[in-house]
């Protein structure tokens, strides 16, 4: 198992370094969840204890209080160049989307404004293929149009470790260092490396958050897993999907693909 984690770590660090070398200026998106926090940890390893790019939180104002407290604490501890990008109100999102997806689409609009204003050519994002069916169609380096749109039918091939090395004219690329990781990989790596996490991931009074999102579209699951060891043991036996607590994911699969096609993470 340690060999598997070492291989995943080495690949992720190589992807991060390549992105910084090929696509500057680069930013890193941080939701404060376990995956993007693990990505920041890997970036610190890649650059000898520092993160040499801005770390961006797309802020809807709807995160749980514990998540904001974690953000502020870790930003100080790791000396992050944290940029908090306020997302536009929900009525700026596509009105034809279902209600929960429309709430999530605020982050798409916030990211679009950020990229247009600050000129980033690449954004590092901590998504994984196994967490959602539409994300399973992604690439490690994913080209985006000028408006951030993603075409699932026009993804570049990635054979034998080859990834895209050019940025589309007027567009940007999303770089996904954790794409091949699983939920269990992230938790095992978090345990091995003692990476900080939001306490809400651990059970209290029979409930915990398996996936963290905005408080208006995320609910906790029933669980007694009050430690990372217990979370790993729980995941080794569960058949429930990771995002079962995300109300957005109970809308149609087509809704999430529309969100991602429009530029959502």
Model-derived regions: residue spans:
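Nucleotide-activated chemistry modules centered on ATP-dependent adenylation/adenylyltransferase
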Residues: 1-265
């Amino acid at each position: 198992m340690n060999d598997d984690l070492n291989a995943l770590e080495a690949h992720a660090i190589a992807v991060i370094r390549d992105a910084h070398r090929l696509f500057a200026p680069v930013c890193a998106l941080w939701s404060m969840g376990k995956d993007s926090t693990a990505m920041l940890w890997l970036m610190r390893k890649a650059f000898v204890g520092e993160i040499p790019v801005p770390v961006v939180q797309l802020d809807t104002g709807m995160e749980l209080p514990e998540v904001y407290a974690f953000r502020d604490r870790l930003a100080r501890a790791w000396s992050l160049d944290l940029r908090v990008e306020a997302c536009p109100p929900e009525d700026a999102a596509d009105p034809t989307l279902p209600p929960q997806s429309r709430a999530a689409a605020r982050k798409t609009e916030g990211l679009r404004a950020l990229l247009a204003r600050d000129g980033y050519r690449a954004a590092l994002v901590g998504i994984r293929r196994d967490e959602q069916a539409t994300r399973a169609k992604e690439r490690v380096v994913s080209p985006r149009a000028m408006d951030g749109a993603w075409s699932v039918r026009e993804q570049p091939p990635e054979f034998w470790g080859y990834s895209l090395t050019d940025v589309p004219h007027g567009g940007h690329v999303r770089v996904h260092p954790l794409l091949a990781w699983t939920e269990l990989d992230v938790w095992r790596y978090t345990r091995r490396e003692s990476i900080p996490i939001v306490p809400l991931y651990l059970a209290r009074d029979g409930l915990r958050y398996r996936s963290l999102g905005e408080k208006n579209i995320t609910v906790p699951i029933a669980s007694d897993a009050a430690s990372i060891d217990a979370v790993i043991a729980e995941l080794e036996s569960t058949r429930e999907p990771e995002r079962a607590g995300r109300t957005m994911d109970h809308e149609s699969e087509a809704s999430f693909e529309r969100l991602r096609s429009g530029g959502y993470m």
